[in-house]
């Protein structure tokens, strides 16, 4: 019997498919799916529980209720399979057909499908070129529409109200035809001749001038073409037949007590059937028009509710006032089909339990409770018991397991040996959230976890739970062992650094072991070997921290892998000598001969991995952990209240600060400072007092005075427990110690502003009521933030994964010569990220030369590993062009060379690696560590903003970047260009620091001059913006009339008078058109020219400019003609943290973006309008001028007559990524986004490799805008995938035709995800209805390229181990499509072949 069923199951072969197509269903197609018409709204007979005939659950239509049994019970058993009972008409088959057989309802009047009507833009509306309002009025029987105008003056598609319709009837009689309702729309749609319309529109397009009209026609044309090419007919958007979902997918379940639980769909279907039957009856009775119309409208509404409840009008509600769940609601949203069931399936063979520490485990092990193991491995145990002959049947085996007989445990031991299990902790934010371990059976009920993997899981033991999953098949076990084993995941995929670094107690133990103490017991002893040190420590002759001399033996591994031993005597401590015992052979003792903090340990593990490989590192990590735990125990470090030593200086420092605050308060009361200045100064005073206190406290804590062997006092690092914990990186930080033993400091209100009275007490002294109350603000904000942050961070990760999920490495090398230029990142004067960190693991795109020569140092296509990076540093290279995924030329994927090294494995990336998902996880996972808030610039933060000079930190020579300058009368350089930068170069030409210098900066040194560290080399006034003269001569005021365009003001203190230019708004009518300026005249009174140009030297003065010169005064080059006061930049909120990252990836336009020059040329200002000024750029080559209106209040960086380059900043502000892409190109926008995102993460101390951000940027740049179509079938202004255009252009160029031209477009991640070619992926992301509507209209076919689509259809994903499967399938498919070439063999050839074969056979005898 069982075999028979198995045989039957095999008959239904699964179809091999290569894609999924979605389209509109024609009425005939719907009827062909159906197994019968549902005519009655009844569901089941409430007495007998049997389905009603011709009802919604009818067994005759949908299949039997019990397996192989008809409804009336005449035929039972399998032997009648396929018989149709003549009594009840039910086919004898399996019940599961009730999940797949559909029915249908023949609608008495056509009904519009709400998705094509209401989902914007309305497809029916576009098709008929009518507005949605008009169509709705027709559909819901409010007005008539003309279908056939005949010989009348009416037009097709014209709307007629009831009155106008009657008038027309009187006038024309039956010359014309007008109808209402869906029938009317159906006829209009049916009358459209697609081919003709498309042709007409294509001809019409080039001649359309109005932008909006052109857009509309293009949209309509696209829709028509979609219908035309897909073979969909427009009239199918109106339903004549409604399909009925199989009954088991909308179940009706009897509850106890005679009530029923039912799916909402049954209610919705019942409504439709009731109204449909009533309408049929009314039509048969030939009822009055108005009644029929009303019924038709109600039918339309009930079908709308069934398809998408609540889209039009009020949602239909059930008995409990809850809107009914329609078909559309079933598939969309988090609880919908896509996300709940297709992407988030549950698995069997899993369990979960609380986790505890397993300090004795090895890195590849986890402790599994026996109870859990027994349950998880049950089938394996049954099989083993039966195979051993210990149990005769499965039933017997079951009994044995239930009784927990002794043999069962032995069998269990065997079963789990070498059978890895997977442990997962939710939330799984990156791929290290699931790892495989070998189980070790333990007593108890908690899973034991190895402490070193906690960092990857972000787990702690305060009640966290973890899930265990068992890989069943051999392939799954193999993957778990080879790819997911915790020992294979030592490096983090986000930054390539070890992720299994010890933390907390282990760090403290190792740090304690490696510290030295002056005059410790045994100081000065000398040992012949480490073994001897061990003895001395064990016997107590020398203590752990004693400074001793030891002869050590080191193993040195040469480049060829040859090992040589070397002995030397080192000064070290007993503890460090003991640590050298666990150091793997091949590592230098110097690595542990230092204070081992968390950073040092991490570096040690990293070095070990790079030099000795995986196996040694894993063993070493375990040893480090055991040692750390051991010595942490021995150290006895603890936190006591006396450990928080309050510095004596604290009280005087606080008193001084209070005195200063009082002084400021007095100044404020006498009116010398404003309220704002007072507040800022007070906050500055307290901030610096806090710094001083904490400095004194740390000095006090971190050192202690001891007497050395010679009886002299000496300072040494203290052994204070709290200090050791913070210093080693085990727990706590200077900031936290400051709150314990210094002062709590300034606090913020809930709105983010700083309270000006700080908490001067610390936690050891205790807080008073007021201080405690102020503290609660911060604490509560922290909690609220955390909750918000988690949700936001999760949503960002989801969007990132969605945009990048289909990006996979598919070839070795795309051969491109493009790349991104990498330089060290320099901010202010510090190198934030050296070049080696930016290029490590990348591939060189353009040969790197030795500095100053033509010899190649690193040839193109070199993978830069650690050794190469050392070489680059040696030769002080400060710029390398590396390959990047942004410039990769591979279609529908990327190549290994453009990606470079797989960070988690340390070698070049493998084919099939899902780099998109890895990138998304690497960016999203630290999201929860980022802050949520927007920072107000105020108080302490505003000090840094008013810089007014450059003080260099390194010696070297001075170099200027894109700077124009003039030399003033003192022989100093004055900068007269905008975005100038100044750099300090060392003797090898490497850039050490770089600063932005504003217009009007005076340089103390000339270019190329030598500077010393600490020199101040540039000065400027941060509060005003000067206008610098570039020529010497006498000045002439133009249009400067007192009281009309300017006023004179006299300074009360100095008595000097100055001229202030009035703003245009403040001038009378006479002054409105005047343009005040200063002209420079030569000795003979003629205009002077700006050197090197034909432009006369005249400087326009904007409103509120201050001039301190008199008419006809003589001036020199580089003098300031006028000063424009800068408004103290309004306290703008800086968006920081997570929202900033989201803004960057969504490519949102900032509020007031910087204005960039659209073309290169000369600036001039045209006629001003109210509130705006007209900026005109005239290109040098005499092309078209570019005009732009700019609001008056924008601070412009340019003056009339200045030359600008395309993409240069004209008005300050945050730059918009779209502008950067348009005006400065793809490389600049990539650098901009990478650097901005990295700034946010760097602030939080999170390391992410640049290439992950680049992967996301590549996906944001996936689409392009067609600027001219050439001979392609694209439309101008259409948005197309770049790969598609490139492929099409390649074919066209090969044929000698005109290729299309395009502009790259930057889409935000949400937009890019929805614009993907795969409609399945887009629909499962967001806006399901819109995506599916669009796809259906276009008859789209999903080629299942990405990961998500394949998960949804239940296939292996085309990445990782599934990549090979997909590759072979695709190759086979390509082969099948190739024309078969038959090689004809000539006679002589055939003879020769035969002879060869015979010879071969002969030679083998």
From Swiss-Prot:
GO BP: DNA-templated transcription
EC number of the protein: 2.7.7.6
SMART domains associated with the record: RPOLA_N
Keyword field contains Nucleus: no
Cofactors that this protein relies on: Mg(2+); Zn(2+)
Molecular-function GO terms, alphabetical: DNA binding; DNA-directed RNA polymerase activity; magnesium ion binding; zinc ion binding
Family membership: Belongs to the RNA polymerase beta' chain family.
Listed name of the protein: DNA-directed RNA polymerase subunit beta'
